[in-house]
């Protein structure tokens, strides 16, 4: 058994954050609800709130063809690499075969977009495997609908599956939790027959994409009971959501005893989303991240859905603050996208007066049924000892080796200094702050981050 009990709430965590400024340049097309620009908006809020001081910020290496074909088929990845808007007429049959078209359009730079999303999750998993950090964040990832040989639901490559496969090299059991409003079908399907990965999805069920995720879908073969689905109805509130989330996840942590956790933080479960009918606020959504942060388990946090960009940026910024355990004010800091957050320019959003179709009795029965299945897990699955496979992203540098071999009379290379975090003592005001000279320096540094798109001080990994 792991010593995975809850820690003191304010325990310090080492947090890595993966971002590439190019991610915001990709465009699904006019009228499409998926806006990669929301990730750039998130990044600017993270920087201007000063959260970068508590993060190790990295620019991930793009995932290679070989990295992505650890899950996806060679034929599918060859298509994504070869097709583009200029030659799409040559790929009509393949577009139909691989479900690339209306919902999943073929846009300029699609393959490179997939490389960034997948590369971030692979790098995050590798960093956790090496025990260099406790939490790794990739808001560029979370594309949970993609299948082995098929695009689906605005997702082309499943960075989550790739990240979990990487985590499994070092961790016997990995827990995947999905709080997107849509069922995490691509991840569930990938691990439906294994007991080394438990997938848990809280989602809207019924006449709603992708139409999967019934309570009765519990896995097959060795994976029976290791797929957990919590189908919900419209209008669920923070209180109702947490009334079922916490008891179920507490039982999952007890019975499955994961060695690592991947949390998909899809923001389309928030009130006001263009596609989602839930009624969560940032506080209710963020409470899920806070729950897992309280455990002594390596945690990967990834993005996902979210189709009201200003609220996506709010949500993932808030959950970054939870990861580093820093309170941030409700007043939004000025940033390049400040006007997007009007008219109130506040971090937190309010719930609406929409009807909550999830009655207490319905949620109680749902909880009872899910926990009854979990109680049938009589033991924690074991794994045979075996050599650890080679890491993905073999280009990762060994930071400690670089530091050890550096000339003491010369400045450390930026690959090292970019990942360094300031000591907590740097953030006191007044006398403890050295007459506030450091605050002034930090303000200049934040401005430099903003003006340069956050690139200059990022560490490539």
Curated annotation (Swiss-Prot):
It is found in: Nucleus; Cytoplasm; Chromosome. Sumoylated; sumoylation promotes piRNA-mediated gene silencing but is not required for maintenance of the process once it has been established. The active site is at 145. Residues 429-461 have a biased composition (Basic and acidic residues). Residues 13-325 are annotated as: Histone deacetylase. GO terms for molecular function: histone deacetylase activity; histone deacetylase activity, hydrolytic mechanism; RNA polymerase II-specific DNA-binding transcription factor binding. Residues 404-461 are annotated as: Disordered. This is Histone deacetylase 1. It comes from Caenorhabditis elegans.
């Amino acid at each position: 058994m792991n010593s995975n009990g809850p820690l003191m709430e304010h325990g310090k965590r080492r947090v890595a954050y993966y971002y590439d400024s190019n991610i915001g340049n990709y465009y699904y097309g006019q009228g499409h609800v998926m806006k990669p620009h929301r990730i750039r908006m998130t990044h600017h809020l993270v920087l201007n709130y000063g959260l970068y001081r508590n993060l190790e910020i990295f620019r991930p290496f793009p995932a290679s063809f070989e990295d992505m074909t650890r899950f996806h088929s060679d034929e599918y990845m060859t298509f994504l690499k070869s097709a583009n808007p200029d030659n799409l007429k040559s790929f009509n049959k393949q577009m139909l075969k691989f479900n690339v078209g209306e919902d999943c359009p073929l846009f300029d730079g699609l393959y490179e977009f997939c490389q960034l999303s997948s590369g971030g999750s692979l790098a995050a998993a590798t960093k956790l495997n090496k025990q260099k950090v406790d939490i790794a964040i990739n808001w560029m990832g979370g594309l949970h609908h993609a299948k082995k040989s098929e695009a689906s639901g605005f997702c082309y490559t499943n960075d989550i599956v790739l990240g979990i496969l990487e985590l499994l090299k070092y961790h016997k059991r990995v827990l995947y939790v999905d709080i997107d409003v849509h069922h995490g079908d691509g991840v569930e399907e990938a691990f439906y027959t294994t007991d080394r990965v438990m997938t848990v999805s809280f989602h809207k069920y019924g006449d709603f994409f992708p139409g999967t995720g019934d309570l009765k879908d519990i896995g097959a073969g060795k994976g029976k009971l290791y797929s957990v689905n919590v189908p919900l109805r419209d209008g669920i509130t923070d209180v109702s959501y947490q009334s079922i989330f916490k008891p179920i996840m507490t039982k999952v942590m007890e019975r499955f005893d994961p060695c690592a956790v991947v949390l998909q933080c899809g923001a389309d479960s928030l009130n006001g989303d263009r596609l989602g009918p839930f009624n969560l606020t940032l506080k209710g959504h963020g409470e899920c991240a806070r729950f897992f942060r309280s455990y002594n388990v390596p945690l990967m946090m990834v993005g996902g859905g979210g189709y009201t960009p200003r609220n996506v940026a709010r949500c993932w910024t808030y959950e970054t603050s939870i990861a580093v355990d820093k309170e941030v004010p409700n007043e939004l800091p000025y940033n390049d996208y400040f006007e997007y957050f009007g008219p109130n320019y506040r971090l937190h959003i309010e719930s609406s007066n929409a009807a909550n179709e999830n009655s207490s009795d319905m949620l109680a029965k749902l909880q009872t049924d899910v926990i009854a299945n979990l109680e049938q897990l009589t033991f924690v699955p074991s794994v045979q000892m075996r050599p650890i496979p080679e890491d993905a992203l073999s280009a990762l540098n060994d930071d400690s080796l670089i530091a050890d071999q550096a000339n003491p009379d010369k400045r450390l290379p930026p690959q090292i200094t970019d990942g360094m975090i300031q000591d907590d003592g740097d953030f006191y005001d007044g006398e403890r702050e050295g007459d506030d000279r450091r605050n002034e320096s930090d303000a200049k540094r934040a401005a430099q981050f903003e003006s340069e798109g956050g690139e200059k001080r990022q560490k490539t990994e």
